[in-house]
């Protein structure tokens, strides 16, 4: 904030007739009476009219005296509070330089027997009134629901002479509660998202707000006839998760026309966003890339495009600015190109560490950001910041960034920034300390060099009352952990973060217990304390639950572990507080709070079960777990013939039983989806239920599960339909895990094939192999002499491609799987599959062989064992004749997510044995510059990397498989292999993985 020094003001004031030093104070009110009137101009702006009303109202609440409000038509009275630049003020020798105040600045000054509060007509006078009430009379507006309006019998003001002009022209604390109009106005936040109307001074107005390229040139309108308007990627024009061709003259022309139309349609808007889409894939055409090469950054085509639009509207719309982003691949500034004076560049901090101040931290991305803000300051006169202040994966999660809020805002202001958007938990109430964070940010945005600890303590005292000391200790507890251990913190922080160590949570709970006791007699304050506690309760609920080493079971119509009473009580308290607060979301864009409730309820009470039953058979289905069948009971033998998995199995309880996925991987789309279930119309004639789910990728899965009324026969009829408007590439895979007794004792039989024991080779601990299309016919039979039972399986389906079988040396499960071909499925078309399972006797079962000892010299995972993140968007499976099994997984080179992962089972390895991990990988290569990909192994239990590295594009050959060595270590539980592209899509459009394998180290 620009503070005009008091001594200078005092000298000016003495010269022009303001109250002399030592003059008696102004008594605005005394015992419910006042000699003052509030005077405003007869032509006052809407915000000045509102300011007069607010001043009158709050003075009455404070003192009991209701001051009259008058226009400035008559003579000056004996004692006036003069608001705004009115006729009465103009009769005084006030010495106030109105020109320096702008739209939002103000001066509060005693001039003779009068109090003057004057500022910009738009918002300045109103801000002056609120600042007077706050700084002189002690009013506070902590949140939309909590304020402090002190009571005073006598109001005296003396020596007041203060001018404030904000450094930042745009100030937005983007939190859910901060959208309230009164809160925003009273805390001087001119947020574009707040519900600010004209009487509250309006706001900074954007249209549209961000990521607008496809608003500007909609693909639905243009792509079919003009694909050249969109990104050229790998020689093909695309509008799928891409950008515009910004050097195409027609795109420039259409962009100018669209912006002019937006200005006509929205005459009050002062900022038009022309900004990249929220994805990668900038255009690779020669013209766009020539600018990139000349300026050394992908920001060059964007800025060149934006400059042309800005030039076109500069004369006709001089009050409108064009806003764009320096974000992700466009964050680095150009070498020489300058932004036009009517261009705003919004620099985004998304990659930075948010637990250490940007100005001083040595984290690489923070250092890089410092370079970028200095660079953009040399190329742009009007720079804004898009900053991030919470975990967007977990709005409820403790996010100790209090050490950086004020220092970062001051750092921005010191580097010429003129507007700041502080993105927080904007979608729901109840997020972690969001009211406090919004309040503190509002104060820092108005005065970047404010005493932030004083602001925090003031809020804590006013908001939490007697619990304030404990709340202060709680905040310091987390900050000290982050600071002392130098823990970096990012915007997708999760419940396993190292600052949420067990000892920290134990102490936090002790502090909250003490805080709740301190305000036990104040229900509203107690609720606020309990809302603040939601964060550590959320961590406990997500990390805890019933004993993880207890297998799930079906009891009382639900499937889950034995209940944990303490966990259930915690969940009950958590949801009671959250429901009272109105929490609706805990993760940006979803899942919503009801998803969390279902997940926590499932942990504490289990998942609902649908049961089908006849005299011979009982089938147990869990719709919430991908429609998984966890029970196939032979009632005569009281034996469950499916293996539903067990604690320790990767993904448990989302593994085992009968499952389906629309992917090469059984961890793909649909595998863990929450299905809805309804009974069939056949009723008792054929007991059954229909499971269905709409997946976000435009696919629908439907499954009819039914049993014969009398015989032990289960039928599963599945259909995967493409409900999207365009073709979708997918496959339908099913897997039935059967429990046939001790490992390696099951007999496998098929028509025209001699029965054989299905065993694992001695040098391995797992065998997975295809038995079809070579399979000579159906049904396939698995027989168990140990259990005295057999299972007969028949599979039919459209495009049925392969049938496979898998067995392990360390668990009884024997898997039978069927997959369709991977193909483009037209809109409205579908893939189908039908599996029939009949229970039989064990006739023909072979006797078990001798006990076998298994080594694990090599442990291999083909791509069908991978998990793909955002499959179909950032990663996918492809048929590749050069891959070892004809398939590979690939990930988009313009991204940086760990989108290919293999969560391996530690039982596949010999205990306490070192292995070297390798990956068969290749790239599509367009150039030698930069990295090709990163790789590593992550230990989730210890929240630490095990090994890792990267490969450079220059060291790899286009479309040639190469072996990458990851490292040598002892594989353990809760570890996974990952690969990630290096956000270098121009040079490496795709990264491929054929397989991973471990070799026993010498």
Give the ranges of each region predicted by the language model:
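Acidic-aromatic substrate-binding/catalytic surfaces of carbohydrate-active enzymes
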Residues: 49, 55, 59, 609-676, ...
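Feature activates predominantly on carbohydrate-active enzymes
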Residues: 51-54, 58-60, 96-304, 314-316, ...
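Extended, loop-rich substrate-binding clefts of extracytoplasmic carbohydrate-active enzymes
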Residues: 257, 611-613, 658-715, 805-815
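Catalytic domains of carbohydrate-active enzymes that cleave complex glycans
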Residues: 416, 443-605, 825-836, 840-841, ...
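Beta-strand-rich recognition/accessory modules
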Residues: 604-617, 624-626, 634-643, 694-696, ...
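Acidic (Asp/Glu-rich), glycine- and aromatic
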Residues: 631-633, 710-754
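Short carbohydrate-recognition loop motifs
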Residues: 689-690, 877-897
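Extracellular carbohydrate recognition and processing domains
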Residues: 941-976
